[in-house]
Curated annotation (Swiss-Prot):
Keyword Membrane (UniProt): yes
Topological type in the membrane: Multi-pass membrane protein
GO cellular component: plasma membrane
Protein name: Mu-like prophage FluMu protein gp42
Matching PANTHER family: MU-LIKE PROPHAGE FLUMU PROTEIN GP42
Region (Disordered): 425-453
InterPro entries to which the protein is assigned, alphabetical: Gly-zipper, Mulikevirus_tape_measure, Tape_meas_N
Length: 631
């Protein structure tokens, strides 16, 4: 089924139409000239990194079996952090509960899964009650959690309950100092205590006993029992709500991660780290590393200087790319779609690297491959234009049909004659370039006042782009080699892949930031910079620090930090764009490339706006635009 796509164009054509048109075209051409050089450098670098990008996924996918981004995030951050937290939890529970430590740890995991409480919050509550002398596993914590759910309280409200009860138990009796926080949190203390006496005392009598200091620890136990009876099952009911289900899912996932790491992976990583620390201590003791700290320090300082020098050249490139990224994001419908495109790019890379050509929906496959080739300049000869690359990539990924605005006849404003514009739409099918060139009619000569095609300007400037500097080429090939080594190391032990997870984690978190609608341009730019910095830093660190694991790990995090700073600087530049004033006057001719099996139609309509003097008409032509005419 064909997708129903739409594209909006805003063109300032007020005043002298010919002059405004020329100015508009020149602005687009200038932007293209600045950006195409940077994008072609990045394009060639990406081509070299393609194997590395593919290999990075091969590291993460076998470990988790979900995908590159999810694998890097879970292994690099979530799973290791969870395993470390559970390890510390066992130690703390054993120290607090003594011989009951293992039983308390098992009870903790089950209780957190069965209630809206998170693991860390449950552990904290258990330890606070136990420290005060109250056994949390005898129903006390369940009573507090149920009552908190009954009144719709949050974690802070529950903390207030625990604090008041714990203080009273430590003192040995209740006073208004402990009762007031409970009353403020909707606990009917005296009514509950009176009910627990079986009607022997009234609420007023219980309040009088409090004033006389007669409500001791037995009264506190009675209060906890009464709170549990009064709110029995409230937490279980809360688990059926959306927030409760989300909380349960988080706890279940955390438990799953802990179990993954319990099957040897975490121990293997700890052993590798322990071996390195032991080796380092031996070298320090025997004097081998007397000069090592200075060597490492000098190396890192030199690397930082090199990265900062590189940053001076990278910053304007990032600014240019960032401007284009913002434009692409706007056309793609937001950074969320752009992040989906990045994910699809990885999958496309995996598929296109296979020797066997697969048929995936006829034209959809060829269109996807065409868009992919446009980005990576896979066509023989010169680099593809910026507009073609962007349109092809987005068209292949999210179904956007490439649309170009030609605006004016060739002779408009005193220029040459005949026909509409230049060849602004390129056929997606691969043809022999010599045949194409031979069949093309001669290009019309430009008049003095003619409008230059923005796409033609892009192609012209692309041909003049200088070669990528040697350091960039070296860095790109270094990524492929480093990641390739990471793939091989996976078979020898999961821990040896850790240095490469810095880059994978930066990619995964970057996609997460781009997909978050609440993040601003500066934060998105920081994410993009962090990805680039982590990759470059890992290469520099691996090359300069003679210890493989330490070199890549230190370099990736150093580079990630520097890249994030660079991205922040670029974000400041991008966060306050100048507003564009749009006035709708004139005639716009729109040429839309028709895909296979699409019926071409031609319409002309006058657009009415809220401005009285607007006179905007559109002429839409469907088909392939030729050199000397419409088709």
């Amino acid at each position: 089924m064909m997708a129903n796509n739409s594209t909006s164009f805003f063109v300032n054509l007020a005043g002298n139409v010919s002059q405004q048109a020329a100015r508009f075209s020149n602005s687009i051409a200038n932007m293209a000239n600045k950006n195409v050089s940077s994008l072609n450098k990045v394009s060639r670098a990406i081509s070299a990194v393609s194997k590395g990008f593919n290999g990075l996924g091969n590291i993460t996918i076998p470990i988790i079996g979900v995908g590159a981004a999810a694998g890097a995030t879970m292994v690099g951050k979530s799973m290791l952090r969870t395993a470390a937290d559970f390890e510390m939890a066992k130690i703390r529970m054993k120290q607090t509960f003594g011989e009951q430590g293992e039983a308390a740890d098992a009870w903790l995991k089950k209780f957190a899964t069965d209630t809206p409480m998170a693991f860390a919050d449950t552990q904290d509550a258990m330890m606070r009650l136990k420290t005060a002398g109250i056994d949390p596993m005898n129903g006390s914590l369940q009573a507090l959690v149920d009552y908190n759910a009954k009144v719709g309280g949050d974690k802070a409200n529950l903390d207030g309950y625990i604090s008041a009860i714990s203080k009273g138990f430590i003192k040995g009796k209740l006073s208004m100092e402990e009762i007031n926080p409970l009353l403020e949190r909707n606990v009917k203390v005296f009514e509950i205590l009176a009910k627990e006496t079986g009607g022997k005392y009234t609420a007023d009598q219980m309040q009088k006993m409090l004033q006389e200091g007669k409500l001791g620890r037995k009264a506190i136990h009675a209060l906890l029992r009464g709170m549990g009876r009064d709110a029995q099952g409230a937490a279980k009911e809360q688990m059926k709500t959306w927030d409760g289900l989300v909380s349960n899912l988080e706890d279940t996932w955390t438990s799953m991660q802990a179990r993954f790491m319990e099957h040897g992976a975490f121990d293997a990583l700890k052993k590798e780290l322990g071996d390195f620390v032991e080796w380092l201590n031996e070298k320090i003791d025997d004097g081998t590393l007397d000069d090592f700290p200075k060597t490492v320090s000098d190396t890192l300082i030199e690397a930082l200087k090199n990265l900062k020098e590189m940053a001076k050249d990278v910053k304007p490139v990032l600014e240019s790319i960032g401007s284009v990224m913002s434009w692409v994001s706007e056309k793609a419908g937001g950074y969320g779609n752009l992040a989906k495109f990045m994910g699809a790019l990885y999958l496309g890379n995996k598929v296109l690297r296979n020797d066997k050509v697969q048929t995936l929906g006829g034209w959809g496959w060829s269109g996807a491959k065409w868009g992919y080739n446009k980005i990576f300049n896979r066509k023989k000869g010169g680099a593809g234009g910026l507009a073609d690359g962007v349109a092809g990539a987005l068209g292949a990924t999210v179904g956007v049909t490439p649309v170009y605005v030609t605006n004016f006849p060739m002779g408009f404003g005193g220029g040459g004659g005949g026909g509409y514009g230049y060849d602004v739409i390129e056929d997606g099918r691969d043809k022999d370039k010599k045949t194409q060139k031979k069949n093309k009619p001669p290009r019309p000569k430009r008049g003095r006042g003619s409008v230059r095609s923005p796409v033609a300007a892009v192609a012209a400037s692309a041909a003049a782009v200088p070669k990528v500097a040697a350091p960039v080429t070296t860095a790109s090939s270094g990524v492929a080699r480093s990641v390739g080594n990471g793939v091989k190391s996976l078979g020898r032990g999961a821990s040896k892949a850790v240095p490469y997870l810095g880059t994978g984690l930066a990619v995964a978190e970057g996609v997460t930031v781009l997909m978050d609608d609440t993040t601003n341009t500066k934060e998105k730019s920081e994410a993009i910079g962090s990805i680039a910095g982590a990759t470059a830093g890992a290469i520099v660190g691996q090359a300069l620090i003679p210890i493989p694991v330490v070199g890549a790990a230190v370099g990736s995090y150093l580079g990630g930090w520097l890249g994030e700073w660079l991205g922040s600087e670029v974000g400041e530049y991008l966060s306050d764009p100048e507003p564009i004033k749009n006035e709708l006057n004139g005639t716009i001719n729109i040429a839309v490339k028709a895909s296979d099996q699409l019926i071409a139609t031609a319409t002309q309509a006058k657009i009415q706006t809220n401005q009285q003097r607007d006179s905007l008409e559109t002429a839409v032509q469907m088909g392939t635009l030729g050199m000397g005419g419409m088709w």
